[in-house]
Amino acid sequence: MSANDAARGANHRRTALLHCVLVAVLAAVLALGSAAVAAEIRLADDSGRSVTLKQPAQRIISLAPHVTELLFAAGAGEHVVGTVEYSNYPAAAQRIPRIGDSAQLDLERIVALKPDLIVVWQNGNAQRQLDKLLRLGIPVFYNASRRLSDIARAIEQLGRLAGTETIASPTARAFVAREAGLRQRYARLALVTVFYQIWDKPLMTVNGDHLISDVIRLCGGQNVFADLKLLTPVISTEAVLAADPEAIGGVTAEPGQAGNLDGWKKWPRLKAVARDNLFVIPADLITRNTPRILDGAQQLCGHLEAARARRGR
């Protein structure tokens, strides 16, 4: 082989090697780009806004007790770095730093915690405060779940935002299955008319759009004030007496407390009183849009089942 042939062969090999290197580098760049795109999370929140995260959230602030509980249910509890007062479940939530409450937030504290995601309660946080948060440039995700059917979806959403789908998805499926089991057992039974008292002074109840009404329907009950326009309307004693519900439910802060329904015993001819159908359920189990709502639902279903059995009285 001549010297020229050897030189041409060497050049050819160098060119081929350079080509291979360039192809490998290009492939690596494309792979990195694809990974970056794949890691990006884009999700519509309950207000219809599109929320984009460059990667799963690692430092989350929750602005409602039920949102905190949902984040833990979705497997993202360890990523929650700040929350509001009354975030008391699970026990680990009680150790999370507080940044205010639904009425007043400590914006400086929020910024100092360096969150990469803030989850707010669209129906419960003051809009003026939310507007300030949006101006900070931190991704804000609105949760507005009101129905039982919204809870599993919220768990799935939060799991996706935090990259904890392997926990969130089975948790959501288990919730749906348990709800379906309760619905199958109770929803087709004879309707029981129900007045649900959430406050006594002034006397307040819920309309048909409230989560409590959804639970009442699940259990085969009918809210006697479902048609009122306000979500939590003030009503009169006379309106309750005229409706003459078969059962009266209430809320209590802690399990085992008596609640505030004793005042109805002044009217012994009221069906709920005459048949001993006054009951209370811990507020956190009947008013929070979390998996524990089904614990409260199970209690409520049991009370309505007892009310059916007492119709002969």
Language model features with spans:
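N-terminal secretory signal peptides that target proteins for export/translocation
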Residues: M1-A16
